[in-house]
Amino acid sequence: MSEKIRVLLYYKYVSIENAEEYAAKHLEFCKSIGLKGRILIADEGINGTVSGDYETTQKYMDWVHSDERFADLWFKIDEENQQAFRKMFVRYKKEIVHLGLEDNNFDSDINPLETTGEYLNPKQFKEALLDEDTVVLDTRNDYEYDLGHFRGAIRPDIRNFRELPQWVRDNKDKFMEKRVVVYCTGGVRCEKFSGWMVREGFKDVGQLHGGIATYGKDPEVQGELWDGAMYVFDDRISVPINHVNPTVISKDYFDGTPCERYVNCANPFCNKQIFASEENEAKYVRGCSPECRAHERNRYVQENGLSRQEWAERLEAIGESLPQVANV
């Protein structure tokens, strides 16, 4: 039996001097111990998800905690049967969370160490979910919400997180005077976004401390009132949260049956994320439209080594065809 892999999810807002130089040092250490993952380092802090065996992840946590800036950094730990990443990336960025505020002439100077929403533990957050007078706002991207979300949470009409501030401004009259609680995967986005909401004048703003990941591991709430699965930005794609009465809410793009398996459209110029069973992925060569299924650079066809005849036969089976190849 192979050894379990641990996946570490973490962040910390803290001032990092010479952050670009520190990012290079961080990458060097990670590679030296064989860690895999993706880490962002900025002047405002660090945000990462990494994976490795027990010994490797323990070495990494000990090394991070040995730096007084990160002595109290909170690692959220999952155990998996296989690696969540294939390579190791550590990148320097201007911010570990980009709200896109400056793009909309918003005040972009948000420091979660100075201004942020009230922390709610899982029990308090569950109580907020059950409170009819509390507005629960999902701050993630649309495709994350579609895979899973808290029951009754608002799905903003946005495609990605950077569009959320404008959406809130456009709809603030609906809940400006109400209690608003926000949530995200691990908490890093909510730290900054809830601070922005406080700056915007919202009187009562809370956030799920530690994010959905912590809620799912809490021994008391056990992820209850979460519907579906949680989207994660690694090879796992999704992880279970509700251990009381789990449900599947997402539906297969092709036949509408319950499905939590996300794939990207095989047309590299489309890349749309869709839910699809392995059977339907093969049947529709992972294309979200007739054009994508017949695209000359269809990645499913390339990855699976389909001959042109085999490709044509699959399309013919669903009433479609490949374009004719001109004779030379």
From Swiss-Prot:
Any one Gene Ontology BP term: tRNA modification
Keywords of the record: Oxidoreductase, tRNA processing
Record bears the keyword tRNA processing: yes
Record's keyword annotation contains Protease: no
Domain Rhodanese: 130-224
Active site annotation, chain numbering: C184 (cysteine persulfide intermediate)
EC number: 1.14.-.-
Catalytic activities: uridine(34) in tRNA + AH2 + O2 = 5-hydroxyuridine(34) in tRNA + A + H2O
Annotated Pfam families: Rhodanese (PF00581), Rhodanese_C (PF12368), UPF0176_N (PF17773)
GO molecular function (one): oxidoreductase activity, acting on paired donors, with incorporation or reduction of molecular oxygen
Family (UniProt): Belongs to the TrhO family.
Stored PANTHER family: RHODANESE-LIKE DOMAIN-CONTAINING PROTEIN 7-RELATED, THIOSULFATE SULFURTRANSFERASE/RHODANESE-LIKE DOMAIN-CONTAINING PROTEIN 2
Functional summary from the UniProt entry: Catalyzes oxygen-dependent 5-hydroxyuridine (ho5U) modification at position 34 in tRNAs.
Protein name: tRNA uridine(34) hydroxylase
Protein species of origin: Streptococcus agalactiae serotype V (strain ATCC BAA-611 / 2603 V/R)
